Amino acid sequence: MKRQLILEDGTVLIGTGFGGEIEKSGEVVFTTGMTGYQETLSDPSYCGQIVTFTYPLIGNYGINRDDFESIHPSVNGLIVNEICDHPSNFRNEISLNDYLKERNIPGLAGIDTRKLTRKIRQYGTLRGRLCNMDADVEYIVSQLKATVFTDHVKRVSTKDPYPSPGRGHRVVLVDFGMKHGILRELNKRDCDVIVVPYNTTAEEILRLSPDGIMLSNGPGDPKDVPEAIEMLKDIIGKVPLFGICLGHQLFALASGANTSKLKFGHRGLNHPVKNIATGKVAITSQNHGYAVEEESVENTELEITHVALNDGTVEGLRHKKFPAFTVQYHPEASAGPEDANDLFEDFLTMIENFKKEGEELCQNA
């Protein structure tokens, strides 16, 4: 079955269709990860996007029940050079092709993914549509140019609060499109976690008596989530806070800094990040299309703690007065290296120190 990818600039790439037979539009992006395709297609941060894999062969170890990062996949489509029809792995339960058919997610194989990746790198992220061969190219292009993708966080966030009990520190995890890996890392440390929707107010969060607040990853432009920014303005300084990815960007906006769209984003499993204080370099998993503007941090109470070695963009922030820090990358990995996993320990240490300071103030009062 032939299928085509039509881009907003009029480019048409023809290949072989796989997966669902539906037509889908989305922001066409690329990821450089050689593995981790199951985590990618189930990562809510990819909501509304058509993901191109730069590695030439995808699907060779199939799909299993353990490696999902959310219950429902959020991608609008997959593009690969070659899809493996006969996966081989002891954990394999279903092929990638069959899984995408079940979930009605379209895929495109047999195109020059290097050519497509170079185009995105040169011209920036493009809107595109995976469609049948009889599609009207001119009409599709006009529709793509007029399309604005919004409300991604609303689509992927939990609708209702729910607990993930533990015996340790109580952590309220604000779900902007949370990867399960973040929750797993908190559970490993026996945290008593309450997951809440993206639009939960500061008053509602504080009513839960949290020891700490975790801001999750999520899709899209952080400025599309004004209710979260307002919530953070009322939260910062009252409870220890740790933010990841979109949570990092929202924290920056709430603190007076600014964010902007990257030309083609950071998506992959091997992005080097430098800790400014120690000089240590961590290889990190990343998935974001926006970043905090470095110059906008200067007139705030924030300090930059980490930078990307590939392009110098801001990768970490810390508040100068209050117990709060954030990173742009994914310390929970899933998939990817675990170089930055100790940030979860730093978060718990910050909570303990904040508690001790509060106890000392009470004793001295």
Swiss-Prot record:
Assembly notes: Composed of two chains; the small (or glutamine) chain promotes the hydrolysis of glutamine to ammonia, which is used by the large (or ammonia) chain to synthesize carbamoyl phosphate. Tetramer of heterodimers (alpha,beta)4.
Pathway given in the UniProt record: Amino-acid biosynthesis; L-arginine biosynthesis; carbamoyl phosphate from bicarbonate: step 1/1; Pyrimidine metabolism; UMP biosynthesis via de novo pathway; (S)-dihydroorotate from bicarbonate: step 1/3
InterPro entries, A to Z: Anth_synth/Amidotransfase, CarbamoylP_synth_ssu, CarbamoylP_synth_ssu_N, CarbP_synth_ssu_N_sf, Class_I_gatase-like, CPSase_GATase1, GATASE
Domain Glutamine amidotransferase type-1 as annotated: residue spans: 170-357
Signal peptide (residue range): none
Chain spans, region CPSase: 1-166, 1-169
Protein name, per record: Carbamoyl phosphate synthase small chain
Keywords of this entry: Amino-acid biosynthesis, Arginine biosynthesis, ATP-binding, Glutamine amidotransferase, Ligase, Nucleotide-binding, Pyrimidine biosynthesis
Entry GO MF terms: ATP binding; carbamoyl-phosphate synthase (glutamine-hydrolyzing) activity; glutaminase activity
PROSITE patterns, sorted: GATASE_TYPE_1 (PS51273)
Keyword rRNA-binding attributed: no
EC number(s) on file: 6.3.5.5
Annotated active site: C245, H330, E332
